[in-house]
């Protein structure tokens, strides 16, 4: 099975397109409801439980198999990434189509033009060099002489480069039966607090008991902003006064989380990079307090980066990697950029997995990152247009 066909079969089913659109519209209505009031968590929880009961009943009644349910979920994810990456997709596909139309033959001029295109898309110099070198070898190995025949290989190599370190590294280190501590770091203005609120909503929807710790005690309004999110999604927020010691906030939060049987504690931190040494000392102090009370914690240190800042996001990631052990990236505002290639640069040059991406403003627009979902969103039109109809209707073994 071709790579394009596999992605199309997984993420896009034309015969289900209308139903999928209705499902997404219904999801949007449901997830916008909390914006009307700050106290909607109980009704949300009941609704989600009813959804789960409904799905279980469908399984029991034989109306929907687990495989069918998983297929529908994959299509929903594909639609989310397709919608959220619309700007990047239009940019990538238009430039690649123009490139393939201009350069018909596979030669060094074509590869140099491809390098320039990818660098302009924020893929990152080192990653681009590796990707294009791989394509040169692939073209030689398969004796490809027409650039059009490299279209699928380009997309496939992007996935391979992302997954070459560890295909499973994008999974969160969350375990049942323990207090899981997530430390959020990042500069001000990239959507760190919003990400915390959406993460809390996501885990609460999965049946987890969630608590937030307002550890950004220096930025004016940061504590109040986190409290608004806590009220909106229906979770407790542990706080002290503005200017207080962030480590003391963490100490109080961990004790409260243990007393209340919390599954996941998400901790906000200050987002200042003016003085790297001060930031390092502050984060180390916070981590010491956490690890004394919860062995091996924090279990995740997530760095929030704004996709719209382009290569500046890469510089921020490098700076934070120097001051603390970042375990994953949350790339926010990916829907607001036409240069979605920064995902590859972060993964390949810093060896930090992207664990979540922000694909819009709704609560459920924070999605777990997956390399195949990402490239589908980035090249969906190209993928669907370049799967031959004969491949849809004939068995794969037929000549």
What are these regions (language model features)?
Residues 1-160, 170, 177-178, 382-399:
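Non-catalytic terminal/linker segments enriched in charged/polar, low-complexity residues
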Residues 126, 155-399:
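P-loop/Walker A NTP-binding module and the surrounding RecA-like catalytic core of P-loop NTPases
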